[in-house]
Amino acid sequence: MTTEHLRFLKKIRRRRRMVVFLRILILFLFLLQWEICADTGVVDSFIFSSPSRIVTCFLKMTEDGSVFHHIGITLYETLVSFLLVTLTSILIAILLWCFHGLSEILDPYMVVLNSLPKSALAPLLIVWLGANTTTIVVAGMSVAIFGSILNLYTSFSTIDQEKIRLIYTLHGKRRHALTKVVLPGSIPAIISNMKVNIGLCLVGVIIGEFLAARSGLGYLIIYSSQVFKLDWLLMSICILCIIAVLLYAIINLIEK
């Protein structure tokens, strides 16, 4: 390894450390400013709460374990909907790729379904499926699945056609083109899709919990807003932010 190469790697590591430091610094300054404004009365601490009050609220709720129950419910529903979206979208995208005529027929319907405001579907899901976990999981799926199918099908369709023709030249079948070229070539798109879907599924689950849950962080947000326990509300939002970051980091780790 040359000196120039070592110097370049050192520069990259230094830049990464600086990025991490600046991210932490921005978060720290924001929390510090928030705490100072709440303590000095610049903002109403009852309405806007403060970092110290949120931490105190979290610690109190850990004593009886209720906060972990709500977190566990939301995580379970999010992961189930995410796994179902990932598997279903891959299978349907494969089906559309295998039958091009079917994709031409269904394309406008997929676009329309993807454009629908999913929050408007949640009350209908409650009528159809009842106020239960299934409804919340389906609500989580509905936010992500149609866009995921469209993205994956587009990725499958834009694979290098020369490689596919080479498979056919060697007397391969369509299934060989799928397993040897299309799917391996689409792995980056699938991983990228998973990064987007994990956040969308979390959003969909929270929407479902707003309307059809008796536990979970979405339920806790609605309940705390109704009884003006804004410390609970902001604590739930902060926990959701942490969950979203951790889930994204896990997918990012899988990609590497």
Residue ranges of model-derived segments:
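Hydrophobic alpha-helical elements at and bordering transmembrane segments
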Residues: 67-71, 75, 105-112, 178, ...
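Generic hydrophobic transmembrane alpha-helix motif, especially the helices
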Residues: 111-147, 154-155
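Periplasmic/extracellular loop-to-transmembrane helix junction in inner-membrane transport proteins
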Residues: 12, 40-83
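Hydrophobic alpha-helical transmembrane segments of polytopic membrane proteins
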Residues: 218-255
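Transmembrane-helix boundary motif in ABC transporter permease subunits
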Residues: 80-110
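Short helix-to-coil transition segments within interhelical loops
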Residues: 116, 156-162, 166-186, 226
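Transmembrane alpha-helical segments of polytopic membrane transport and secretion proteins
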Residues: 1-25, 249-256
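Transmembrane alpha-helices
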Residues: 138-142, 175-208
